Amino acid sequence: MINANDQVLKSINFFPEQIKDSLKESLKVNLPKEYQQIKSIVACGMGGSRFPHYIIKELFKEEIKVPYLINDDYNLPGFVDTNTLVILSSYSGTTEEVLIAGQKAYEKKAKIIGISIGGKLKEFINKINAPGYFFNPIYNPSGQPRIGFGYLIGGILGILLNLEVLNYQTEEIIFAINNIEIKKIESEAKLMAKKILNKYPYYIVSEFLTGIGNAIANQTNETAKSISSFRIIPELNHHLMEGLKNPQELKKIAIFIFFFSRLFSSSIQKRFFITQEIVEKNNIETLWYELKGQNKIEQAIGLMAFGNYLTMYLSSLYGENSATVPYVDYFKKKLKEV
């Protein structure tokens, strides 16, 4: 059972506050005037500091005015120059890939901004005299980036709004956050966790929910210590359906969870129904979860919260510690020894 005082549960319950707090504070960051002239954005981040960019990029795909590339290794694209904004995202401020990419961005004379709680990233940002949003994660007592990713969501939004590469009313975002039915979402997530226990979940998403599929798959790995994948419609319709036949053993544990929205385009909605039919024809179990909410932002925030609760309760059912990441820690330790 989940203890009501558990730090992870506290953090998850605080998720709406994480976004609201960081959105308000990041809007106050003083950005140099020349930052308004950027022609592209490259966001550097890994894991729980990466998928918030993917969420924002897909949620506001039709509104963001400049190319927005997510960079998840040590190197930068060749086009990065003085007209590029490089966002260095590292919740802890110690992510190796981000720090190295940051140095390369500086050498390329890119415009740089950091998002973090501090650490080496803050030291680097201060050294090069660049702006940054450095937050105090009071609404994330767990200390885990993937469980406090609301700070990254709000922080990224604040920066994009500040730069005017995204035009959206802050009040509308806050209204959407306040409008989600968090207790109902928690109850639904708890029920689904029981259904996917001892299964290999494939999270099926599309359009403005695409990045959240990535987030839930990530959290299933780290929080629940369970294997998972996320797949995107319509891309999966061009290959994955033919791969459902074998191996036969996989059919016993595979489960496809379709995150469906009536706000999807009509073409995508049709594909969801037909895809579910084909998956079931291959004797693979499916679950259908229809998003509620008046608009895309409300539905997206609701699904983010759902993923938080789903993976926490799944972790509890497996008897795992949802806060720790022993193999990630072991891997980092071994890297330092090489």
For each feature predicted by the language model, list its residue ranges.
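Short, small/acidic-rich helices and loops at N termini and domain boundaries
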Residues: 321-338
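Glycine-rich phosphate-binding loops that contact phosphosugars or nucleotide phosphates
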Residues: 35-182, 194, 260-285
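Short, surface-exposed amphipathic charged segments that create phosphate/polyanion-binding patches used
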Residues: 85-86, 146-155, 241-247, 301-306
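Active-site phosphate/pyrophosphate-binding segments
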Residues: 4-14, 23-39, 139-142, 161-253, ...
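C-terminal active-site/capping subdomain that shapes the small-molecule cofactor and substrate pocket
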Residues: 245-326
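A generic structural motif
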Residues: 70-74, 226-238, 285-294
